[in-house]
């Protein structure tokens, strides 16, 4: 039996999970998602980790492996670090075993990953454009419009005449939005227009990694934006791709989940290797 932690330090949030792994059986012990805002992400990660240990009734010495991903490599108490594309792919397959591609839509970047049934990465590609296709841009626009971030998706679905943001540059795109507001364009039509622009780029990103059919799982901070998900599937259909994008209630935790599971795998592999060396020495 292995008790493992996964800590995903992103640009906008720290996601932390605890798992108990025994063979093919995994038990999710605790989870936590903390927005960073203006706090130190590493102190926040340590606080979150200690909070999960307390919630699960564990001590730090009970944890066999602390795996980090994202920006977590500098975390003082981590055991090992895994690249984000590796952890998101593994976490996606844990959440949806049918997932053969992943769209990680984060605060600063979008990333498309093609993976196999085990969650092993086959290929990936990141957005190379400026941040107008990112979660941070969408959050800034929501703040300017005076709406809560969790209202963006539902408002977008109410649009009747969306105004598409044409600029790739975040600064110019924000100027476009300011002009739209001055022209009396409604918030739903502005948000739907932003979703259309973002979804078009994300669909092209999926196509570029060879995601031709099957299930795509959205992960990252924008995965639960239902308006973006709906628009993404519309863009996928327009580009004649035979894939369907889904999310999962725990999609934001995919990176942390994948880190924890890869950490358990590495710990068990090292344990077997150590046992083999002892046996050979005897």
UniProtKB/Swiss-Prot annotation:
Chain positions recorded as [4Fe-4S] cluster binding sites: 130, 169
Reported pH dependence: Optimum pH is 7.2-7.5.
EC number from the UniProt entry: 1.3.7.8, 1.3.99.n1
Any Gene Ontology biological process: catabolic process
Cofactor: binding comment: The iron-sulfur cluster may be a [4Fe-4S] cluster.
Cofactor: [4Fe-4S] cluster
Catalytic activity field: cyclohexa-1,5-diene-1-carbonyl-CoA + oxidized 2[4Fe-4S]-[ferredoxin] + 2 ADP + 2 phosphate = reduced 2[4Fe-4S]-[ferredoxin] + benzoyl-CoA + 2 ATP + 2 H2O; 3-hydroxybenzoyl-CoA + AH2 + 2 ATP + 2 H2O = 3-hydroxycyclohexa-1,5-diene-1-carbonyl-CoA + A + 2 ADP + 2 phosphate + 2 H(+)
Alphabetical UniProt keywords: 4Fe-4S, Aromatic hydrocarbons catabolism, ATP-binding, Iron, Iron-sulfur, Metal-binding, Nucleotide-binding, Oxidoreductase
Listed GO MF terms: 4 iron, 4 sulfur cluster binding; ATP binding; benzoyl-CoA reductase activity; metal ion binding
Keyword NAD: no
Assembly and binders: Heterotetramer composed of A, B, C, and D subunits.
Known role: Catalyzes the anaerobic reduction of benzoyl-CoA and 3-hydroxybenzoyl-CoA to form cyclohexa-1,5-diene-1-carbonyl-CoA and 3-hydroxycyclohexa-1,5-diene-1-carbonyl-CoA, respectively. The enzyme also reduces other benzoyl-CoA analogs with small substituents at the aromatic ring.
Name this polypeptide is given: Benzoyl-CoA reductase subunit D
Species of the source: Thauera aromatica
